[in-house]
């Protein structure tokens, strides 16, 4: 599977790695998992350095709308995104939507600095705290 993830409940860190062609269905499964497991306030590291997608702009935008809608209804944790420089233009609208959430977020062009940064961020606060 081109998209796999690891959940560390002790450190409240969700690490996702995308490799190869990530389909809309695979990314939807990732978002469904976040919803079902209640991981919205976890710190998230998304390593897309080895990723590509055959999704068209309309599908990428639909994923951005889904994530943005989720951010408007519940608190979310910090996000570090590692993406190759040549892919930034493809995802720029979605990255802009994600940046609008009330949480720390940074985009990196290397997974190492992204990991270093996200580990320094505290997890998000739940609505109950």
Language model features: what each stretch is:
Residues 1-129:
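Amphipathic, Lys/Arg-enriched alpha-helical "gate/interface" segment within cytosolic domains
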